[in-house]
Amino acid sequence: MDSTSFLPTFLDVDLTISHIKCLPKDILVKFQGIKSNECEFDYHVLQREIQHTPKVKNNVEIDEFCLVEERVSGEWQRGRVMEKKNELYTVLLIDRGEELRVAGPQIASACGNLFELPPRVVFGIFANILPVGEKWSPKALNYFKSLVGIQVKGYVQAILPLQMFLFEVPKIISQALELQLGRLVDGDSFRLIVEMLEEFPQQMPDLLQHKRPELSLGNKDTSLDIQHVLDKLQPSLSVGSTESVKVSSALSPSKFYCQLIKWTPELENLTAHMTLHYDTVCQETSPTCDNFGLLCVARRRNGQWHRGILQQLLPPNQVKIWFMDYGSSEAIPSIYVKKLKQDFILVPLFSFPCSLTCLHSPDRDARIFQLSIFKQALLGQVVYAHIDWFNKDECLYYVTLQTQESTVNSKCLLKTVGTQVLCPMSDSKISNILSETSVSDVNSFAVESFMGNIEWSIDSLNKKGILKVGFPIKTVQMEIEAAYIAFIAYVLNPSNFWVRTNDHRNEFQEIMKNINKFYDLCENDEMILRKPEPGLFCCARYSKDRRFYRAVITEINGYKINVYFLDYGNTDSIPFFDVKILLPEFCELPALAMCCSLAHIFPVEDLWTKAAIDYFKKLVLNKAILLQVIAKKDDKYTVNIQSVEASENIDVISLMLQAGYAEYFQVELEYFPKSVSEYSMLNSESKNKVNIKKVISALLEGPKSKKYHSNNLVENNLSLPKSLAVNISEFKNPFTLSVGPESSWPYKEYIFRPGTVLEVKCSCYYGPGDFSCQLQCKSEDLKLLMEQIQNYYSIHSDPYEIGQTACVAKYSGKWCRAAVLTQVSKEVDIVFVDYGYQKRVLIEDLCAINPRFLLLESQAFRCCLNHFIEPVSCKLFSWTRKAFRDLWNFISSSRGLLTCIIYALVIIHPNHLYNLVDLQSSFTSAKEFLMNRGSAQYITLSETFPSLFSLYSYCYSSFNIQIGSEEEVYISHIYSPQKFYCQLGRNNKDLEMIETKITESVNLQNFPKYDSNKMRVCISKYVEDGLSYRALAIPTDSSSEFQVYFVDFGNKQLVGENMLRAISAQFPELLFTPMQAIKCFLSDLRDVDIPAEISSWFKDNFLGRSLKAIILSQESDGQLGIELYDGSQYINEKIKVLLHAYGKRHCDQACCMEKSNKINENKRFTTSLKGKTGNNYRHNVINKPSPVTYSERKIDQLMHPKNIHARFLKPSVCYKMEPVSKNKMKTSLNDGLKGIKIVPGAAHILENRRVGQKSVKVVSQSFIRALNQTTSQNPYDLIRPQIKDLPQPQIYLNAKVKGYVSNISNPANFHIQLAENESVIIRLADALNATARRLRERKSVKPLVGDLVVAEYSGDNAIYRAVIKKILPGNSFEVEFIDYGNSAIVNTSKIYELQREFLTVPQLGIHAFLSGVKWNEPDEIWDDKTVDYFTSKVHNKTVYCEFLKKHDQKWEVNMICDEKCVINELLKWKACSKLQKSALQMPQVLSQKVRPGDNEMKKGKSNESEGSMNSNQQLFKIPLEEFKLGQLEKAEMLNVSKSGRFYVKLSKNKKILSDLIVLITKEEKKSPFLSMESIEKGLECLAKSKNTLKWHRSKVEEKYVDDKVLVFLVDCGIYEIVPVCNTKLLSNEIRNIPRQAVPCKWIWFENSKNISFECLFADLEINILFLKYLDAVWEVEILVDDLLLLEYLNLNTVPVEENKLRLAEIVYNIESKTPVSSCTIKSFTWVQFQNDRQYSGIATAVSDPSDFSIQLEDFFDIMKYLFMLLSDLPETLQTLPQEFIIPGSSCLFKYKSEDQWNRVEISEVSPQSLCLVLVDYGFSFYIRYSEIINLKVVPEELLNLPRLSYPCILYGILPAKGKHWSEEAKIFFRDFLSKPDLVFQFREYHSETKLKVDVIHEKNNLADILVASGLATYSKDSPHLDAITATESAKNPI
């Protein structure tokens, strides 16, 4: 049956979305939905009919309908065949949306009557929506996936083959556009895209013509009139030309519409004017389009108005409009259709119809190629169109499309930019038309609305007043201590504004009149500046008033040019055709705008607020002012302003201060001239006022002098009123105020801002509700203070006076600082302020504190756990005994390393300030720990604090923001790009709730009064809008004024007390909802000096906007470092571009560059590069964590320098002239250049800062060629670039990147090339070698060490970038090729200058070393074997590098090759002992300090004679294991003495201990015996134990006369007397491994001598808490089962059965294990089995004696518990991240046929499949790679349960023949393991490898049976073999 046999009869459809298929690179979003209006009963009846209808088993082909039988239920369903392989069919169930795979007998032919009812499930594509870029963003993917389950309304545009609907949903489209997730595409173009992307079995049918009521409106005459008008407006394009275009609409490849890219700004301009006009008049009545075909204007879905032609009326109240500037049609509501004004009709069309020329070509390949480019253009890519010919009859341009990568387009692009815009009418005419379209005040409103133009200031003028452009233009100057009549030309803020003095007023008016008179007569394509470059003088049309002004070009930005208006000071970004050549007669007048700053004031905030700027503008704009010049720095004047027109002497500075918009600061003497120190502010209250009228009259009546020396201004020593000199120090941090009266508490205290993250240790603990912490960073300060206190009070006894708060008292025998709390008779209660302990002592035991001991803050700050959790079954802040113990265990187990996050400040009665905190260890947090233990639960906001508690601050929340996550944010307040506040988009509901509750609170009749003495949190009115917001109030010096901080927005304000309200207890939400303002900074701009102009631009453009933020870092104060994106605009990068234009960063670089006389263009090139590669950069950052590399397009520009963009890349070049000694001068130099040397430098290095240096000269662009020529003639004096001058490659930490190792010296010195830079490297080499011949014609260079050059590589005679490493004899140099890493010796004749354009490419060979290797060791320590092994692992292979940290110039990397960690492979390599000894940083060795001689060990020392070894010849002793106080370790008792000292070995060191045994075994075979003479006390040696008969590392304790010595076995913890003949020399090879026996002493041993505990723990694993190191022994606490030893002994009075693993020992240990980390991979826990112990169990997965798994009976209880946990898991678990799809990762997996989750571990990964191991059963299986979405993250509780199956190998035997087991042996082995009552005896245990076991059944050993049967043989290390050998020896004595 044909798939199109039934078509629904509906157009408008209601659907419930059931499934979404949306992939990042699949631009079509597909869905499944169920129609809401379907009748369930009809489908129920149909299903019954299907079951009873006879089935015809004919052959069914692909895409045909059929009936299919389900295997499980046996029911037949309707379906369609999707795939057929042999007799297996994949069938889509059309009524359920599922796919089924069945065999041929389960398929039947479709019966016609059964398929009359449409499919119940609708399959379709969301129409008319495409991604913004090349693929969908993660945010867009989440949005579409969120649509599942939502009911939507839309209409079907078309029905494709296979019943696929094109479904347009207006709601989804509008939301996607609003969230900037996608872009709108017209219906015709979208259908064409679908047709080209989707492969259908037949041609796609036309759009279904569902007939709606239509009304014919026009006649042929009207249509002809319109066509006549359109023909007149049609643009004329030259045949044979090539234009840059984008496709705006398309019906087919034979009919589509294009727009020229160069017309884009004009189209935007027209659209903006029309939108402005029609939005203004939209409310008014206007003529409707009442005749068919009339030209009209309509508002499209994006809110903009466009010109169109009315095509058709559609019900209900809609009109189909064809938009003439786009070529597409759209249905528009009739209310948004207006009559097109005559003014807008005359503007030419911006689209033109096209057809592909190739469609008529017989060349099939050409057609395919053109269609592929056409498809790219349809998807939004800009292409080039070559106009082949024009068909007048069809009115079509036939074109050939070309991509931007095409090599011919370097010429085409030149034709595009700089040529005239071929329109039938001039731009000036368009401008006049647009300017006349105002309705009332539309034009004035338009000027304010067009603020999208970027405005910033550049420092473009020379310090000597010469502008380096085509003509020497002098700049007006003002002199210090002079006064001028002036006018303000432009205001950015009071610190940055531009003035024009009255001196040149007439000349300026005259020249402006002539400029506009001349340029207004020019056509749009006339007088265009053909080759615009930064620094060129021009005449530019200002975009707001369309008038021309003198300007200078600051930056080229695509088709737009940024200019700075020299007579006004402002800037603009305008199209290139609005930049005209400036005639010489207009260059005679100097540049008039001078930058000024108002003296003595600065903003109340970090930035000037809009209100302050507006107030300043009101005072100074549009009026004459008296300008008093106080000082000058660079080109900026510091001035005072008084109004000329006011009746009184009005000082602007005083007015700004009195209005509260500014604050006062004193003059810095080094900034101003000396005479200025006598200056002060003009004050209206002063007795000696300046008579401004006299000053003005002198200025106006006297001769036209350039300045006026106002002696009165100097003599009048005026001062600022004291009331205005506000101390701002109190307002910097709202949380620095003390709680109580300052006089009552003499100690300084820490008061932290909520959100602060601190590294602390707990110093005092009274419970979760009261504990004290100390800052770790202050521990050394406290230690020093304590030493000083002990020294002082050991010889002084200052008497304490009653009534003093501060004192000192003894605690634990030491004097400590204390404070008196209360006095009771002769005793006082004190608190030790540095520790938090409280104690009652006698007054006579106190001493007075010396004032110098008060300088350090109180180190203990009081805390209680965050109020968002509360005790279980208790009141708030009341905790159970269990909670007390649990939190203490958490603190104790943290090993002293705790992170404290401040969430809020709270006052607890009577006046104690507490910090509400959460503590975090490296594994978990206290909150989670207590909740997991059942000691706490979440609190709701329905309750407030008890009456004894009150909030001192609002609450902080991290909002679960993760590093690397992406958030939608709204900027709520901006100080600068380095400090601003954001609100999260997902918190909108909370903000709305806060607003609602505040409104309700304000409307209360009896609201509580605000009491400033008791509270800080309040509701405050905001002055500018009169509304109330949550705030934090800080008192000021004024009793009635408060500084308030609006916690949900981030800004501050000074308000009166009457504007504050307390928060009522009825609204706890206002207290407990976290502060919504999140403090942020732009990540890579924090330490950059950002001018106020750029900060203002940032504020004007993005305040209140919805932006996308990527979180990169979090500072200790909670501030987030982020990257901001506005749609596709990368804001961080844009600000860097603005900084480049402003020049500030290069001024800062100038000092460093001059000091070193080196080029440092790093910053400039970086910003220039990033500005051009912004899209590439953003794409990488958003979609993948891989490093960003240099754009390949830049290499194209280097290879094709004629490309117009190549000159945009080159920064403006200036040259700095410096003296050169005479003996270096060459006579060939031109006379004008004698005695100078040429230093390429940044354009803004124009200051003379060094004493004795000649003034800097700036060379114009026209002189650069001569300079380059001079450089080649005299290369010896050139200061060349260094490696640091290259842009830094963008590398992201912890990101896995594909790459190749390009050069290897050793594991600590190699180079990496990133795979994504592969083509860049090749093309860079091509570009370099394209210039080779030209370079070789020049003279060779004589560089210095560190210079960047081009050098010829002898291997291929090609040239590459290189850096000089060494200067060698014979005119040779050692160079390193920086993009590859290898070095070579090159003669000076093969070394050339590196051209400037190649400095923009970062170093592509990344210098690296292997993580775990000492990066700064000399290369000589690496032997050839190690280097060869490392090379064999990575050479010519793809590696995955994880960049961890940069050390100097080397990157520390973790490298994966062949799915294995390279460093781990090196460690496993047995021949790498030297590597392990001196290069690899084993974790245990890391803690040891390097001793002298570590790297001086020589080979062959063991060859010395026996008696030559003396103890003083040993290079160093065996180190001790190092621990931190509070460190917790699992351990096993080794030996216990009666003195209480015992030795333990750490569980974590089992691998080290086993490796040590191997090393000792090898060592004793080659080491010589010691003689009695060579043995001394303290000598470390090898000794053979009489108990174990093995060799051990030992230390000699005593020598005895009978040739015996007492030795201490340092790895066993026991003493033995051994004969001298059992001692051997201990070499240095194994001396660096720390002692494995750790000496300990139980802290309660002295008090518990009656307890004999040595027998209890001889073989048990325990936890040791290291407390104090004293007398060469660690005092420790012992924990068993998370209980202190004393508690354990009290509870466990019944002996535990030793041969059984206890469930409690495992299950209750779960919570003490390390939780899963989001950044690391953790495997399931392995149980610690004891060797030689027997366990009962069963075998699970059995292959052969070398590969089988077992389960033990002891695990059966755990298995039940595990099964219960797995059964309770939800379906919606987090999917395992892509980066964890590697071998060793733990996860969960569920079979489709089962309902049970299984714990699995990834064993193997390939591109096609994954091998998973069921860790609880031992079986392994494969899944397809596409099923990784079914792998889920393991919850922490399940991760900590031990695995229940263990892989094993049968101990002591090998196959009888060969390396593999025979089939007979395998069958015998499997049969034996199938028997019941098996016993497994563990022989050797190695964590996470196979266990070696004996298998016993009824006392029969399986290994012996296999050997006896001839199926196996004993291995060399088999104990069975030893037993046989011993027996044979006994039978045959020698």
From Swiss-Prot:
Record's signal peptide: none
Span list, region Disordered: 1490-1510
Alphabetical keyword list: Repeat
PROSITE patterns found in the cross-reference section: TUDOR
SUPFAM superfamilies linked to this entry: Staphylococcal nuclease, Tudor/PWWP/MBT
InterPro entries: SNase_OB-fold_sf, Tudor, Tudor_domain_containing, Tudor_TDRD15_rpt1, Tudor_TDRD15_rpt2, Tudor_TDRD15_rpt3, Tudor_TDRD15_rpt4, Tudor_TDRD15_rpt5
UniProt protein name: Tudor domain-containing protein 15
Pfam family name, one: TUDOR
The keyword Repeat is annotated on this UniProt entry: yes
Amino acid composition bias (Basic and acidic residues), ranges on this chain: 1491-1504
Entry keyword Methyltransferase: no
Domain Tudor: 59-117, 289-347, 531-589, 799-856, 1011-1070, 1342-1401, 1574-1633, 1780-1838
